[in-house]
């Protein structure tokens, strides 16, 4: 059997699990029907490293945060009697890749709903299958119920998902550097986008950035420092923050940089209070 055929068969099997378990509350009744699930194999979900954020992707998104049905992604936090969510998403990993950061953040913030946004189809499918397997295999302790992923373009539709001041943390881990100058407008940090991030981030909330590309690091720092609603946090603060430690070592891209003995550049910024208009 060729690799292409094996890949198709593997994806079909995982798609069946995804259809059955993607939106259900994983509990003892599900365990009785489903054997322990193996974690997905990344080699069957290969896709290009980056995706053009300006392309006309076929994406589903709510017309406003009030129209977003979070119960499908976080059924454990849905009160069926009151027909409402018991919590809101407060942590977002923009361009979450293969989900390593979310998975390490999950036990550290068990009462926080964490969302990964990823634009690539197969990478999103991989993270969905990874979370389904983790939820199923850790059902007795309700493990990993607080994380999920959706396919979305944060550069276009972030305010469609989140209310003003809803988020407490936003992560940008190893984003596409877009090396060519004519592509800089596609970088995840720009003046316009920073105003959108400031809108969905609460006062005192944190933007976390990490990259192995010095030019991109300097670009993000420059734009964040020049924005009136963000202020850089000190290296001493970074050294004491557990999220920085997790971000440095949890992502698949970060592990790759570590193996290649590359540099990692980190910068964190706090959301300042919005000034009163006189």
UniProtKB/Swiss-Prot annotation:
Where S-adenosyl-L-methionine binds, per the record, is at: 95, 118-119, 153-154, 173, 251-253
A GO cellular component annotation here is: nucleus
The keyword Protein biosynthesis appears for this protein: no
For this protein, the record's CDD domains field holds: AdoMet_MTases
The pathway to which it is assigned is: tRNA modification; N(7)-methylguanine-tRNA biosynthesis
Instruction: Please indicate which superkingdom the organism of origin belongs to.
Output: Eukaryota
Give the GO molecular function terms.
tRNA (guanine(46)-N7)-methyltransferase activity; tRNA binding
Give the main EC class.
Answer: transferase
Q: Give the subcellular location.
A: Nucleus
PROSITE patterns referenced in this protein's UniProt entry, alphabetically: SAM_MT_TRMB
Q: Which InterPro entries match?
A: SAM-dependent_MTases_sf, Trm8_euk, tRNA_(Gua-N-7)_MeTrfase_Trmb
Q: Which Pfam families does the annotation name?
A: Methyltransf_4
| EC number of the protein | 2.1.1.33
The entry's family comment says: Belongs to the class I-like SAM-binding methyltransferase superfamily. TrmB family.
Family matches, as NCBIfam families: tRNA (guanosine(46)-N7)-methyltransferase TrmB
Q: What protein is this chain from?
A: tRNA (guanine-N(7)-)-methyltransferase
Query: What's the source species for this entry?
Result: Kluyveromyces lactis (strain ATCC 8585 / CBS 2359 / DSM 70799 / NBRC 1267 / NRRL Y-1140 / WM37) (Yeast)
This protein's gene is called TRM8
